[in-house]
């Protein structure tokens, strides 16, 4: 019985994945998207860490608020102003290659004293791949194991598919932002139409009542009736 238990423990230990104690690199930076409410007369900044020699694509869109516009700036980790836009509804900017450090993205609504803005933005990093690991994997495969299939062609096809899938996800996210902006516009227009329609109905009813009262006064005989 003890031998069976020891064998089971040994089997479980062999199945456990190896744990790296030291020398672990930083976790990969993930793409992200964020929607926030920018109050009137306020400026809000965000910081995003980026590795060196990568590609950072920034997309933003104002999906709610009067005017659908906002000021946008993008600064490098060294404080260099890379992008500066004023009163824009949307924008797409790419930084390539990136510097190691924190990039600063600022959205400014200080020009508006009344209307708050609903802003959507997305950060897309070019997924980095360790070239040494890829080369080591390719060298580990013997020529007779490739079955006459070129590894470079396979890697190129996979990379093309990955790029197209990432672009599809990006376009779907943008379409979702466009849909949210259009829905906000339609809801705002519906509220205005309902309000002014109610005002028109109230005015029509008031005019009708006044006309009836006026006509009744015209036909009233105020002369005394002889008895």
Curated annotation (Swiss-Prot):
Q: What would be an example GO MF term here? A: signaling receptor binding
Membrane topology term: Single-pass type I membrane protein
Q: What is the effect of changing residue 45 to S?
A: Significant loss of interaction with IL1RL1
> Mutating residue 106 to S has which effect?
Significant loss of interaction with IL1RL1
Q: Which GO terms describe its biological process?
A: cell-cell signaling; endoplasmic reticulum to Golgi vesicle-mediated transport; Golgi organization; innate immune response; intracellular protein transport; signal transduction
- Give the location of motif COPII vesicle coat-binding in residue numbers: 218-219
To which protein family does this belong?
Belongs to the EMP24/GP25L family.
Task: Identify this protein by name.
Answer: Transmembrane emp24 domain-containing protein 1
Species name: Homo sapiens
Q: Which gene encodes it?
A: TMED1
């Amino acid at each position: 019985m003890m031998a069976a238990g020891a064998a089971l423990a040994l089997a479980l230990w062999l199945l456990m994945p190896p744990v790296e104690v030291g020398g672990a690199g930083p976790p990969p930076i993930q793409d992200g998207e964020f929607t926030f409410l920018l109050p009137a007369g306020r400026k809000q900044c965000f910081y995003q860490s980026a590795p060196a020699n990568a590609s950072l694509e920034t997309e933003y869109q104002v999906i709610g608020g009067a005017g659908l516009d906002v000021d946008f700036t993008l600064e490098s980790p060294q404080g260099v102003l890379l992008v500066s836009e004023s009163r824009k509804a949307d924008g797409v900017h790419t930084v390539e290659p990136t510097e190691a450090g924190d990039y600063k993205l600022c959205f400014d609504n200080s020009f508006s004293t009344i209307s708050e803005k609903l802003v959507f933005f997305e950060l897309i990093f070019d997924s980095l791949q360790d070239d040494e690991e890829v080369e080591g994997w390719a060298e580990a495969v013997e020529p007779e194991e490739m079955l006459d299939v070129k590894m470079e062609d396979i890697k190129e096809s996979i990379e093309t598919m990955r790029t197209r899938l990432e672009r599809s996800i990006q376009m779907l996210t943008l379409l979702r932002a466009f849909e949210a902006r259009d829905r906000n516009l339609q809801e705002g227009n519906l509220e205005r139409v309902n309000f002014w329609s109610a005002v028109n109905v109230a005015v029509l009813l008031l005019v009708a009542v006044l006309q009836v009262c006026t006509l009744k006064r015209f036909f009233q005989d105020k002369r005394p009736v002889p008895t």
